[in-house]
Amino acid sequence: GLEALSKLQPGDEVTLMGPIGRGFNFEKPNHIPVLIGGGVGIPPVLFLAEYLKNLNQGLAPLAFFGSELPFPFTSVKSSIRIDGIKNNCNASIADMENKDIPCRLASLNDFEGCYTGYVTELAEHWIRTLDQKELKQIVIYACGPEPMLKAAANLGETYQIDCQLSLEEFMACAIGGCAGCVVEVTLPEGVAMKRVCVDGPVFDAQSIFPRSQTLQ
């Protein structure tokens, strides 16, 4: 899959099949998109931020990214203020800054300008500045490793915020045939096994991490 793609050269032809799967839902009117990306979940969230910015629906995304490795993107000192975030936490991704998208970075490795801690903790600093009316306007969109997604789901549970998670799973066929990427999902009618490639990769946070799990 990815190894074969990495060997392609400019001008090579590729056959694609799609669209397949279920993406993020943006139907909630006039909401505030809060984007959380970690590790290999950073690139898709960057594209999501740009997509939301260009929707022409008046949406103003706010992005938080976390990594324990040096960020593989040019970082800059942000000139965009974010309430609840200390002034010394000012590192942003240059592409986000150029598109006027508020953004902050987090890491446990004390990178310059980054929040020292988990990216979900950084997002919570901002969330705590909001009143109940503002909280109801938020939708969290997250992509990253499972512990980060669980923490994002916990944010949603704690503050009663809608939260959607894009899962990372190994996929063999990626068209729903092999069932190699199934995850356990809790639905109103009970527990079911869903394929991330065609039933996801995006799921409601509480279906992946029910309340009993977010509190663990």
Which sequence ranges carry the predicted segments?
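FAD-binding FR-type
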Residues: 1-34
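Short glycine-/acidic-enriched loop or helix-start segments at secondary-structure transitions
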Residues: 26, 45-47, 151-153
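Short, flexible coil/linker segments at domain boundaries that flank nucleotide/cofactor-interacting
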Residues: 28, 56, 133-135
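Conserved S-adenosyl-L-methionine
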Residues: 30, 54-61
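Short, glycine-rich nucleotide/cofactor-binding loops
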Residues: 32-43
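Histidine-anchored nucleotide/phosphate-binding helix
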Residues: 44-56
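Reductase modules of NAD(P)H-dependent flavoproteins
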Residues: 64, 69-216
